[in-house]
């Protein structure tokens, strides 16, 4: 019941949860999941953006498509989309990484690709992916221990 909002449509939080499952499926099919357990690695989402175009209504059958679209020195860029009746409903771009679960540090993509025997992959980000990634680098992030104004709607 938490998947559906007041208008009998899938809520945006559930869409991201289903996209999590799509990335897990990609990890299993690519052989990455076995390497995660073997090397004590973890998956992390470092950034995401999503576009919504059509509603997903109660009882709609959805298809999720997940694909790796780019790799740089540190990040794997994944595009995910949800489809109903052959039409895209939403599309997300995610900047993801593989971490050492002991240290929490993001591993270089070359190290991960080498473990998967994909040593010669060359998938630089397209201009639109790079523009999003670059813009995200200059986006301000909240500072620790900074309290909101007293008239703010959100309080601690």
Segments (PLM) and residue ranges:
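Catalytic strand-loop segment that frames the active site of acyl-thioester-processing enzymes
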Residues: 1-25, 29, 130-156
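Charge-rich alpha-helical segments
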Residues: 29-32, 101
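HotDog/MaoC-like acyl-thioester-processing domains
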Residues: 56-61, 68-156
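Short structured motifs
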Residues: 46-52, 64
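Low-complexity, acidic Ser/Thr/Pro/Gly-rich terminal tails and inter-domain linkers that flank the onset
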Residues: 44-45, 56
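Short, basic/aromatic beta-hairpin or loop at an interaction surface
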Residues: 34-43
């Amino acid at each position: 019941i938490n998947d559906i909002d007041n208008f009998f449509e899938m809520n945006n939080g559930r869409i991201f949860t289903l996209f999590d499952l799509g990335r897990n499926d990609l990890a299993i099919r690519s052989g990455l999941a076995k390497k995660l357990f073997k090397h004590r690695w973890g998956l992390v989402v470092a950034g995401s953006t999503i576009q919504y175009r059509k509603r997903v209504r109660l009882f709609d059958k959805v298809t999720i498509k997940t694909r790796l679209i780019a790799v740089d020195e540190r990040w794997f860029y994944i595009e995910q989309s949800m489809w109903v009746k052959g039409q895209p409903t939403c599309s997300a771009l995610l900047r993801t990484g593989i971490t050492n679960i002991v240290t929490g540090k993001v591993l270089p993509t070359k190290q991960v690709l080498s473990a998967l025997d994909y040593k010669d992959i060359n998938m630089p980000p397209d201009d639109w992916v790079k523009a999003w990634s670059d813009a995200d680098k200059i986006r301000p992030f909240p500072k620790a221990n900074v309290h909101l104004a007293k008239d703010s709607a959100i309080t601690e």
